[in-house]
């Protein structure tokens, strides 16, 4: 880090200009100050991450920021700033007869009143300086936000400084803007260009050899898993987003994908999804439907919880790998697909470590290339002494068969049965809701992928939610689907409407409020009007349900 460079105090006087702030002509409890010394205007506090200066000697604005142990500097010449328009009126402020000019910037109007007679020079906003001899005494944004100078004083106890020297890295305006944004939050890389493919020769690691921050491949290569630490940035975040990048490494088809979390084992008698990845499907409890079909690990039971699905996504038809194999004039294929969704309520930040995984169902040797990061955004409005309530996260069911390549059954029970889960709440929960994700599958004309089907949810026998999940916007994502088939009517397969998903998109959950649910034992039921199978072609539904909320003491049985 470059050391701060202090400006000498014994040669040049320092002047402070103080401004009151108003909103809609009402004074608010906030003020602004700028400092002027030796033709330099200091616009920021010494403690601010980004520093801003107006250099009147060299006719430039300078902004600096410390990021990743480096100092970056942006230099903006005065002649590239917004130009002003002279207005007719004048007014007296602090005894100075002030001229009026206006600026137009990004569809905003900024009115400025300034004097050239004051010893101090400058403006509280470096974009709006009428000339280098001006001191702005009043600034009005769009007629309703106002800064008005209330005093100009000489100060003796202020030490202006600049936090750069010749070693600072000069970047352009767009690069500096990127650095500012990146400095405001923390990116936690989870997976980096990992291949998810079908590889039956993958060796399953031994449980006693598993370590934190190492990537493991399971279920014949179709799942990547990693145990990560819940960092202070995650624990203290205001919002957490999962950002997934995906591109084809040889697979041409749209595939089911899921990003999910599984707990680390705390007790020997607790079964987790990791047990099945390590030792096989027999480790998972079995759900048996009315026709004796067996489904492995799909509901919460004593000693077992299904995974917490944080992203439900679908790969596009062959983006990246097939771009040059399916060239069409005026079709500029995407290089990759980026999925990003807020997952704050689903990340167990009161844990020290969790397993996080990505599943893509495919039998292709090339498969797909994925990267995943968690973006943690710090809290801006947290009051001093305020304590965060603990998150309540209780996964109830998931028919997403992340071990499809290990012969885990598809979620096709809804044709002849209702999915029923018993659970118990032992605490008072604030803002309790069920996050319900649902997508229908069966890829022929009469299959549930292409036929709207009713979904209903009942809690303790009372209907709390119903919807026909359906997406009609799939044509929006045509340029992410180079390998999609083109039909004689001009449509592409990726254009077709589907049961709540499109090739190359996320399927966000529905938020179902359950605030009336009290402590005690309950039962939740999911009813889907699943259509009949045709020969070997089967319908199924990928659904997941997680209870979320806030509480002081988590104790769910």
Language-model segment annotations:
Residues 10-185:
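Extended soluble regions of mature proteins
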Residues 1-8:
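Hydrophobic h-region of N-terminal signal peptides that target proteins for export
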Residues 165-557:
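Extracellular/secretory-pathway and virion-surface proteins
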